[in-house]
Amino acid sequence: MGFLWTGTWIVVLMLHSSPIQAFPKPAGSQDKPLHNRELSAERPLNEQIAEAEADEIKKTYPPENKPGESNYSFVDNLNLLKAITEKEKNEKERQSVKISPNDNKLNVEDVDSTKNRRLIDDYDSTKSGLDRKFQDDPDGLHQLDGTPLTAEDIVQKIATRIYEENDRGVFDRIVSKLLNLGLITESQAHTLEDEVAEVLQKLISKEANNYEEELNKPTSKTESQTGKIPEKVTPMAAIQDAFTNGENDETVSNTLTLTNGLERRTKTYSEDNFEELQYFPNFYALLKSIDSEKEAKEKETLITIMKTLIDFVKMMVKYGTISPEEGVSYLENLDETIALQTKNKLEKNVTDNKSKLFAVPSEKSHEETDSTKEEAAKMEKEYGTLKDSTKDDDSNPRGKTDEHKGKTEAYLEAIRKNIDWLKKHNKKENKEDYDLSKMRDFINQQADAYVEKGILDKEEADAIKRIYSSL
């Protein structure tokens, strides 16, 4: 009996020992800290991809269960090495095919549907390649080869754009962009403005000189008639539009007075080139009636004075001294008052001249005067020609000066009376009268500029200054 119990215990011990040999227990307690450390640390992406591929291989091709094998770690390591080798091979193949950054950008943009508009623009025949060359440079601050412009080039380019577009806002937009980007400071912006203004003045002067050279070239009568007055425009509606636009954009006044204004004043005013004066019917009719060649100088003086007053009214509207509606009303009064008073003065001079020079007119002249109204007007023009002080003989220089001065004083007296009338009737809504100090400074500057350009004589400019200083 004791032997039986002994044999039973031996069999039990053998059963307990045999699984240990057939199924070895992994040393989990030793690898646990290493396993936790691997989980907490971030492994390289290539290693994670290789491990994932190894797991795929395991699932797809499970290892064969051979009876003699008790541990598959060797098979796992082999599969892992194969996956890593294949991954490295794929990486090398990708690196061997090099794609330029621009091509890569195009591929990405091809996928992005929001970029299709740029591709459509590429097929637009109206757009040049230079327009798309620097798409992040809308102000054109690069040369054709892509190199940045120098400071002088930028100043020249800004001034040219302002001159071509007749828009002072071009400078403001560019400078505000540079200030927002932090590329320039406030003081540098003021310096840039002065430099651009200087270059812009040179461009205007150059254009004016070119225009004068073209005028000096002989042209046929047919060519000179091509620049006649365009189709009829409602005068005050056009002026009202100009003032209304000026409220929304202060560059309108600059456009009228800076580029076109200075260019106008440097021109020799011909009979068919009165520009905006056609919007003043009374004054324009007066100019058309003064068509004597010997009165051309007085005619140019009258045009210059009228344009100066127009610019002055525009300046008052720009700085808010008067409203656009009041500006239109003032211009209407200028048109009516100056034209009427100047015409009366000229007619009086012509009548006095006729009574002095032709106290006993001949029968021939009497018949011609009574024949038709056209002939009578022609005779009056001839009398006015004889009265022209600028064409008198040199034997009476003092008389010539007095007559010339009297003609100019007649114009200026009409202007003075008109401004006095405006001052008396500008009392609505407690608005201030004209700022006469600004007015005098403005007129003095314009008169000096006209003398330099040869539009006015020194004596005429002094007379204008004297009239305005006495207001």
Swiss-Prot record:
Residues 32-45, 86-96, 363-409 have a biased composition (Basic and acidic residues). This is Secretogranin-3. Interacts with CHGA. Interacts with secretogranin II/SCG2. Interacts (via C-terminus) with CPE. Residues 23-72, 86-105, 357-409 are annotated as: Disordered. GO terms for cellular component: extracellular region; secretory granule membrane; transport vesicle membrane. The lineage of its organism: Eukaryota, Metazoa, Chordata, Craniata, Vertebrata. The modification Phosphoserine is found at S40, S365. Transmembrane segments: none annotated. It is found in: Cytoplasmic vesicle, Secretory vesicle; Cytoplasmic vesicle, Secretory vesicle membrane; Secreted. Residues 1-22 form the signal peptide. It comes from Bos taurus. The gene is SCG3. One of its GO terms (biological process) is protein localization to secretory granule.
